Amino acid sequence: QHWSHDWKPG
């Protein structure tokens, strides 16, 4: 499942 918002871990 691909999320609409690209989350950046950090």
Curated annotation (Swiss-Prot):
InterPro entries: GnRH. Pfam families: GnRH. It is found in: Secreted. The modification Glycine amide is found at G10. The modification Pyrrolidone carboxylic acid is found at Q1. It comes from the Eukaryota. GO terms for cellular component: extracellular region. Keywords: Amidation, Hormone, Pyrrolidone carboxylic acid, Secreted. GO terms for molecular function: hormone activity. Belongs to the GnRH family. Stimulates the secretion of gonadotropins; it stimulates the secretion of both luteinizing and follicle-stimulating hormones. This is Gonadoliberin-3.
